[in-house]
Amino acid sequence: MANQKGLHVVMMIITVWLLYAAPNIHGWGKEGHEIICKIAQTRLDETAAKAVKELLPESAEGDLSSLCLWADRVKFRYHWSSPLHYINTPDACSYQYNRDCKDESGEKGRCVAGAIYNYTTQLLSYKTAASSQSQYNLTEALLFVSHFMGDIHQPLHVSYASDKGGNTIEVHWYTRKANLHHIWDSNIIETAEADLYNSALEGMVDALKKNITTEWADQVKRWETCTKKTACPDIYASEGIQAACDWAYKGVTEGDTLEDEYFYSRLPIVYQRLAQGGVRLAATLNRIFG
């Protein structure tokens, strides 16, 4: 117990340093990742909830969502982790692990799907891990999984290499300059939060949780289903590239101004991907720790 308490103190110091020493650049954006982790934490069974609380540093005060951005911020110290946030595909609306899961040097497995496989497998050792070092790695593994499960559900994190996931497609979001990737990372969610929820993130979280038990209730079992003990990121990535083609890229050309028509037609897709990310993160942790 003393060793574990000491570990939590070390983790708190390291985590705080990493969080505040790095620039504020995010995946889904702060709100999107928080939403996914908030949804997930409410769906954890008792065993998984206990494991998550034990692995989180004391600074998190038991709140997984407070550290769901850790993986974004730490990549400026862990440079090797940058390619683990996305998948580059050909301009063909399809994803294949063996073809697409690699970094720019061609090293296989270095993409968000490969990272999810890796870190969920590490978490399987939680029950038998004894040393402080392995516990520290499992804390990082939990934070990586929680973040990457969000990234893989953002459609433009599984998208075309030719435009860097929409990052090179310059448009306007209403009156503001933006690129298409940033619109899906942040602008759609921020606009919804401001216009539909009085800038209250909890209102959006509550609405999504309600939809999970009502509007999407008949789909949740399918979202949770995975034949592996850990996660099924290839399914999530295949859905992602399809959503990118059908919704993110569709009808958009360089220099366009995207306004209400794009916002209201794409918002349901954003809502669904956030909900799927939260449901699947919880299901993954329940399988691993159960």
Curated annotation (Swiss-Prot):
PTM info: N-glycosylation is required for enzymatic stability and activity.
Entry EC number(s): 3.1.30.1
Annotated binding of a divalent metal cation 3, by residue: 28, 33, 151
One Pfam match: S1-P1_nuclease
Signal peptide: 1-27
Known catalytic reactions: Endonucleolytic cleavage to 5'-phosphomononucleotide and 5'-phosphooligonucleotide end-products
Listed GO MF terms: double-stranded DNA endonuclease activity; endonuclease activity; metal ion binding; nucleic acid binding; RNA endonuclease activity; single-stranded DNA endodeoxyribonuclease activity; T/G mismatch-specific endonuclease activity
Enzyme kind, highest EC tier: hydrolase
Keywords attached to this entry: Calcium, Disulfide bond, Endonuclease, Glycoprotein, Hydrolase, Manganese, Metal-binding, Nuclease, Signal, Zinc
Cofactor binding, per record: Binds 3 divalent metal cations. Use Mn(2+) and Ca(2+) as cofactors with ssDNA as substrate in basic conditions (pH 8). Can use Zn(2+) with lower efficiency with dsDNA and ssDNA as substrates in acidic conditions (pH 5.5).
Residues that coordinate or bind a divalent metal cation 1: 72, 85, 147, 151
Domain of life: Eukaryota
GO biological process: DNA catabolic process
Glycosylation sites per record: 118, 137, 211
Region (Substrate binding): 147-196
Function of the protein: Endonuclease mostly active on RNA and ssDNA, and to a lower extent, on dsDNA. Can cleave mismatch regions in heteroduplex DNA containing single base pair mismatches or insertion/deletion bases. In contradiction with PubMed:22506810, cannot hydrolyze single-stranded DNA and does not cleave mismatches.
PANTHER family documented for this protein: ENDONUCLEASE 2, ENDONUCLEASE 4
Protein name as catalogued: Endonuclease 2
Organism: Arabidopsis thaliana
Organism phylogeny: Eukaryota, Viridiplantae, Streptophyta, Embryophyta, Tracheophyta
